[in-house]
Design a protein with these regions (language model features):
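Terminal peptide-recognition signature
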Residues: 38, 63, 76, 149, ...
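Short, basic/aromatic recognition patches
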Residues: 150-170, 226-229
């Protein structure tokens, strides 16, 4: 089944059971809808209002206070992120949706599994080796220069360098993820179908036959293999949020020293250790998507604290669009080299 078929075949009883196990029992139900507390964005259930509706005809959620329309896939992402729970898309979202009524919240989350590994090995600055996938899987996909990317500052040379492919059957841009040694440790897909983008997500691991080509994003850096020599020569690394930024940077006039944490606006200790193993590195610059509304400073201090946490190991800094250079959700790379360079000159250095 595709994602739409999965959603269409959801049983209301299974959704109610899942919500109950997540600490959100139904407040009210009639023949058309079930009303739940807004646990989608309230980490504290006591602060939740009774404005999260599940509509039986569409099998979709709608949060009337903040999150708006959501499929069950999107709802789970909101739920985890509101609680700072690190999740694995396949284990904690896809598999949960496929077996709603049997979900055990004490066993289902990926955070204890991955965080314990980072803590165990990160303290001693040791790396563990992620499982490797057969590179032959990439031959399933064709080589193509997707206009969605070539019209957004990504060159043909960048697409070739990072071995970007295209899936005809899934209508997705295929993004191989390699570790620092060039081993294939995951494959992600950038959805092009609008329905899937809105109701499931834009970037997800790829499934071929019965295999999900997934990996813990928190234990790798996209682009590290392709750009490690540039990072070593220039002694600096730009850490972006998404893969697209790494490819956009390939078109700049200076060597590409960019990697991406992929979906996480912050670098963790394990990822920093990957960078610290590159000889001679002197500075790590966080270059994340713009998340601040005018007059706010919460995101500024989030970036500041992330840098401060690791400033004893290496020079840490971050770019921040103070003067409206970026719109909400835009990355520092989206506006091209001139804007990126100007933001870089005015980066915040944290000691």
């Amino acid at each position: 089944m595709d994602y739409k078929e999965i959603i269409d075949n959801l049983k209301v009883s299974s959704v109610k059971e899942l919500m109950k196990r997540l600490g959100a029992e139904a407040i009210k139900e009639d023949e058309t809808q079930v009303i739940f507390p807004t646990v989608c964005h309230n980490g504290d259930g006591e602060e939740a209002s009774s404005k999260l509706y599940f509509y039986k005809n569409t099998k979709m959620f709608y949060c009337y206070t903040e999150c708006h329309a959501m499929s069950i896939f999107k709802f789970l992402k909101h739920y985890y992120e509101a609680r700072d729970i690190e999740y694995d898309w396949v284990t904690d979202i896809y598999n949960v949706v496929m077996d709603c009524s049997n979900f055990n919240p004490n066993l289902g989350f990926a955070k204890p599994r991955f965080v314990s590994l980072r803590d165990k090995y990160g303290t001693e600055r040791k790396q563990i080796q992620l499982p490797e996938y057969n590179r032959g899987a990439l031959d399933t996909f064709i080589r193509r220069y997707p206009p969605e990317w070539t019209n957004d500052g990504i060159s043909h040379a960048a697409i070739d360098k990072f071995d970007i492919r295209y899936s005809i059957s899934q209508n997705k841009i295929i993004i191989p993820h390699k570790d620092v040694d060039g081993r294939l440790v995951g494959i992600r897909g950038r959805a092009l179908n609008e329905w899937e983008i809105e109701n499931v997500g834009k970037y997800m691991p790829i499934k071929l036959e019965q295999t999900w080509y997934k990996h813990p994003l928190s234990m790798n850096l996209y682009g590290i293999h392709e750009n490690k020599e540039n990072i070593q020569k220039r002694k600096i690394c730009f850490v972006a949020e998404g893969e697209k930024s790494v490819l956009q940077a390939e078109s700049f006039s200076f060597p590409n020293c960019t990697v991406a944490t992929c979906g996480s606006a912050g670098i963790n200790k394990y990822q920093l250790n990957i960078l610290l193993k590159i000889p001679g590195i002197q500075e790590v610059v966080l270059c994340y998507d713009h998340e601040e509304l005018p007059g706010e400073n919460k995101y500024f201090y989030k970036l500041y604290e992330n840098c401060k946490k690791y400033s004893q190991y290496v020079n840490m800094s971050f770019v921040y669009a103070r003067n409206g250079e970026l719109s909400l959700k835009e990355s520092p790379f989206d506006k091209g080299e001139a804007v990126f360079t100007e933001l870089l000159k005015r980066r915040v250095k944290v000691k």
